[in-house]
Amino acid sequence: MSAYPQDTYFNSNPYQQQPYAYQPPPQPQPQQPPYQQQPYQQQAYQYNAQQPYQTTDPYAYQQSPPQSSTVPPQSPPVQVTHSPFIRTDSSQAVSFTDMARMAGRPQTFDEMYSVPESFLEIEIRNPMTHGIGRKMYTDYEIVCMTNIPAFKLRHSAVRRRYSDFEAFRDILERESTRVNIPPLPGKVFTNRFSDEVIEQRREGLQRFLEIVAGHPLLQTGSKVLCAFLQDPAWDKSQWI
């Protein structure tokens, strides 16, 4: 027999296995579905009178509201085309002051005092009757002021009678087939030397020259236009 008691032997054994406490296995956790990024959806547009570009999208740009809703909307400025040809008749003339007023803006210093880029002023005035009996006729003074290069003189004054205007119009029709030449005032057979008839004819000749001399095709393509308006020695027999 061993010299040590049995209970002392088992207690002193260093390799004796200790009793194992049972632990249940961990329960499996339910699996979460994988994360899926939702596609970007644009929010519907909502109209707002105070802020017409407002949307429900938090990332959209929001326009700031107007400072005051009582301010009336301003209409766009009126664009006025400045004609290079100014009519000399005071009832039909359009000055730079009138054009600035029509445009809705104050007139500038340059518009008040500068010379227009191109202008043409024609005036028929001072009718005079010459001769006696059947040889009586009336001629008119044509005053022309311009800075258009097509005209040789900046200021000129010549006298023409009605028959000169008739020849001038016929020559223009032959020279410029693409331009419709306006008619002359009609002939008068009774009381043609009265003041009323002469004034009516003067106004008709004035309108005729304003249309003809202001036409750009006639200014550059006609040879008789400048000569008729500015040459004192103009003779219709040289052009017929």
Swiss-Prot record:
Q: Which Pfam families match?
A: PX
Q: Report the sequence similarity comment from the record.
A: Belongs to the sorting nexin family.
Q: PX domain location, by residue? A: 118-235
First-listed, main subcellular location of the protein, grouped into a coarse class: cytoplasm
UniProt comment concerning the protein's domains: The PX domain binds phosphatidylinositol 3-phosphate which is necessary for peripheral membrane localization.
* Entry's Gene Ontology BP terms: endocytic recycling; late endosome to Golgi transport; protein transport
Using the UniProt annotation, give all residue ranges assigned to the region (Disordered). 1-85
Keywords recorded for this protein, A-Z: Cytoplasm, Golgi apparatus, Lipid-binding, Membrane, Protein transport, Transport
A single GO cellular-component term from the record reads:
Golgi membrane
Question: Which PANTHER family does this UniProt record tie to the protein?
Answer: RE52028P (PTHR45963:SF2)
Q: Briefly, what is this protein's role?
A: Required for retention of late Golgi membrane proteins. Component of the retrieval machinery that functions by direct interaction with the cytosolic tails of certain TGN membrane proteins during the sorting/budding process at the prevacuolar compartment. Binds phosphatidylinositol 3-phosphate (PtdIns(P3)).
Q: Which GO terms describe its molecular function?
A: phosphatidylinositol-3-phosphate binding
Organism classification:
Eukaryota, Fungi, Dikarya, Basidiomycota, Agaricomycotina
Key word Ribosomal protein present: no
Listed InterPro entries: PX_dom (IPR001683), PX_dom_sf (IPR036871), PX_Grd19_PX (IPR042138), Sorting_Nexin (IPR051074)
The protein's name in its UniProt record:
Sorting nexin-3
Organism from which the protein derives: Cryptococcus neoformans var. neoformans serotype D (strain JEC21 / ATCC MYA-565) (Filobasidiella neoformans)
Compositional bias (Pro residues): 22-33
Superkingdom as given in the UniProt entry: Eukaryota
In its keyword annotation, does this UniProt entry include Transport?
Answer: yes
Q: By its UniProt entry, which Gene3D superfamilies does this protein fall under?
A: Phox-like domain (3.30.1520.10)
> Composition bias, kind Low complexity: at what positions?
34-54, 62-84
Residues binding a 1,2-diacyl-sn-glycero-3-phospho-(1D-myo-inositol-3-phosphate), per UniProt: R161, S163, K187, R192, R201
Its localization reads:
Cytoplasm; Golgi apparatus membrane; Prevacuolar compartment membrane
- How does this protein sit in the membrane? Peripheral membrane protein
